[in-house]
C-alpha cells in the first residue's frame, strides 16, 4: 500500500462566528471541530498528518498535540496557498494526500477510506469528494462530460445558468497523488477578483495536463457540512448528537427521548441503562450497566458504576461505585469518591470526600474534605466544617459511626469507629472509638415563662 498523508486546513479566522474563540476550536458535542476531523483521519493508517494553522495557532496545537504536525500560514491567501505551506513536510514524497477542511466535524473515516480506495481504483492524480443536494446555491459545481468524466469545478458565481442547475457539488475534500499535487500548486495563479490561490485550480491544471481526475460521490451531504457561523455550528451539533445517540441505542442503551438528551462524543454507557429526557452527559463520563439517570441530571467527567440510580442530580469529576442511590438534588463536586451501596439523598453536597461502603447521607448534608468509613449514618443538617476562612482542613469519620442531626464537625477532627455523635453537637475535638460525643448547651426549662412572651393569641 502506498504512503498516506493528510493535510487539514485550519488557518481561517472565522469572522462570521463573531467569537473570540478560534473557529475550528468551537466544540461540537464536547470536542473541537478540528479534533473531530483529525481523530477520524488517525484511524486511516496515515503516515503523517499536517495541520495548517493561522489564527489561534498555539491553541490549536495544544488541542492536537501528539496527533498532528503543524505548519503556520501567516497570511491567509486561499486554500491552495494553505496546502502549499506543507511543501517542506510533504513535497517530493511518493504516496497520496488527503486534503480535508478543519471545519467539517461530521466527516467520517469510512467516507475518507472509500475516497482513498476509489482514487486508487481509478489510478487518478486527483479525486474530488462530491455529493448531491437539493439546493446547491453557493457551492462549486462538478461538471462532467457525456461519459460522466469530470471536466472541471465551476464556482457558483462563475457558473452559467445551465451549470447552476447541476446539483452535484464539491465538498472541499480531496485525494491527490502527492507529487502531482505539489507540482501543480506551484502553477496556481491568484488572477481572480479576490486575489487568492484556490485549490480547485489544481484540478484544472491536472486536467490540462491530461491527467486522470475522478470524483467520488458520497450519499450524505451532512458529512460535508462546513461550519462558518453559529447557525451551522448548531446544525452540526444537532447532527452529531443524533449520530452519537443512535449509536448508544444500537448498543443497548435506552434513551427515552433522544432528541432532548445531550451526550458528548467520548461518553461511554453500559447496556440496559436508561437515560431520561433532559439529561446532560459530558466529557469522558463512563456509566455502567443497568443504571437509571433521571431528567435534569448532569454528569461531567465522572465514572459511574453499575445499578446506580441518579435522580435529578449533578456529578462533576467524581467516582461512584455500584448499587448507589443519588438524589434528588444532590451535588457531587470534584474528587468525590462514593463507594458501593451508598445512599446520597436530597440536597446533599460532597467535595473531595470519600464515602465508605454502605454509608448513608440521607438529606441536607455537606461533607467537604472528608473521609467517611463504612456503614456510617449522617443525620440531617450535619456539616463537615472544613474552612476557617483561610485554610481547608480534613474530617475523618471511622466505620459504623452514627452522627446525629444538626451536628457540626469542626475540622481538623477525627471520629473513631463505632462512635456516636449526639444530635445538635458542635464537635471540636477528636472522639475516641466507641465513645459518645456530645457538645451542646444544657437545656433549661423556665416553667410558666412562656405566658409572658405574648407568642400566642
Curated annotation (Swiss-Prot):
UDP-N-acetyl-alpha-D-glucosamine binds at residues 9-12, 23, 73, 78-79, 140, 155, 170, 228, 333, 351, 366, 377. GO terms for molecular function: glucosamine-1-phosphate N-acetyltransferase activity; magnesium ion binding; UDP-N-acetylglucosamine diphosphorylase activity. It is found in: Cytoplasm. Pfam families: Hexapep, NTP_transferase. Acetyl-CoA binds at residues 386-387, 423, 440. In the N-terminal section; belongs to the N-acetylglucosamine-1-phosphate uridyltransferase family. In the C-terminal section; belongs to the transferase hexapeptide repeat family. This is Bifunctional protein GlmU.
